[in-house]
Amino acid sequence: MPGPTQTLSPNGENNNDIIQDNGTIIPFRKHTVRGERSYSWGMAVNVYSTSITQETMSRHDIIAWVNDIVSLNYTKVEQLCSGAAYCQFMDMLFPGCISLKKVKFQAKLEHEYIHNFKLLQASFKRMNVDKVIPVEKLVKGRFQDNLDFIQWFKKFYDANYDGKEYDPVEARQGQDAIPPPDPGEQIFNLPKKSHHANSPTAGAAKSSPASKPGSTPSRPSSAKRASSSGSASRSDKDLETQVIQLNEQVHSLKLALEGVEKERDFYFGKLREIELLCQEHGQENDDLVQRLMDVLYASDEHEGHPEEPEAEEQVHEQQPQQQEEY
């Protein structure tokens, strides 16, 4: 796909305007708020084919391709669940469609992954990409879901990349792109240690000096043997009690985590339904629909509450009225 070319001003200098293949000139546009350059690239080329062909890359090849294009150090397909790589791909294909300053390249938690995918969804909408992003599946870090999406994105990249140079490190403006942790690692799986290694008698057995040949070892008295065996049994019981308590605590935490995840998925589904309704009625130029879309796609905590000052003013206005009633 040939890319746009830049025209020259009458004095022969580059004026950063863009001329398309059909001769239409698109003037250079600049965001006055953030001072970022944004070019109008038109609509993206949508890709609908998801069938496996000879061009489909293996998981090792596709991770090597991702690392090579955007200078990352991913080792597994599952690490694409953070969404950061896709955000940088969109900045590479369509400069100005996404702000990399808001992308969390060091994301480690699921809500940070969702934040990145919200930015990706907004860039898809801005470039009229029809692909539905299965966010609730991708952020789980499952291999097959992430492999299917990156294979589709590779075809989307091939259909829209025009061969222009791009420096991913410079585009991130110094942000360290740390790979997310392996989703397969469970925080509850602690390394198992043998009970013999943790027993208080194990260290004593190892540290006891070897008896010299020919010398008769002295036998400990019955009182010492009884005291040592009693202390060892008490230590074993204490350790067993502690293990039981920790297992109960882990079980309760797992139940709490499952409940939170179900609640999150429930509200995420509601927000997704609201988003689809807003997109269906987005062409009607309804102010309420636009305000809802702004709240849904807000990437900053403060951007999602633009009406809080007005609410405070209404409270202050109602207080004198209540005093007059008394």
From Swiss-Prot:
Keywords: Cell cycle, Cell division, Cytoplasm, Cytoskeleton, Microtubule, Mitosis, Phosphoprotein, Ubl conjugation
UniProt GO BP: cell division; protein localization to microtubule; regulation of microtubule polymerization or depolymerization; spindle assembly
Residue stretches making up the EB1 C-terminal domain: 235-305
Chain positions found as Phosphotyrosine: Y166
InterPro entries registered for this protein in UniProt: CH_dom, CH_dom_sf, EB1_C, EB1_C_sf, MAPRE
Domain Calponin-homology (CH): 56-158
Post-translational modification: Phosphorylated at Ser-235 by CK2 leading to enhanced cell adhesion. Phosphorylated by CDK1 and AURKB during mitosis reduces the binding affinity of MAPRE2 for microtubules.
Stretches for region Disordered: 170-239, 298-326
Cellular component GO terms, alphabetical: cytoplasmic microtubule; microtubule organizing center; microtubule plus-end; spindle midzone
Pfam families noted in UniProt: CH, EB1
Gene3D superfamilies recorded: 1.20.5.1430, Calponin-like domain
Protein's job: Adapter protein that is involved in microtubule polymerization, and spindle function by stabilizing microtubules and anchoring them at centrosomes. Therefore, ensures mitotic progression and genome stability. Acts as a central regulator of microtubule reorganization in apico-basal epithelial differentiation. Plays a role during oocyte meiosis by regulating microtubule dynamics. Participates in neurite growth by interacting with plexin B3/PLXNB3 and microtubule reorganization during apico-basal epithelial differentiation.
Protein name in UniProt: Microtubule-associated protein RP/EB family member 2
Organism: Bos taurus
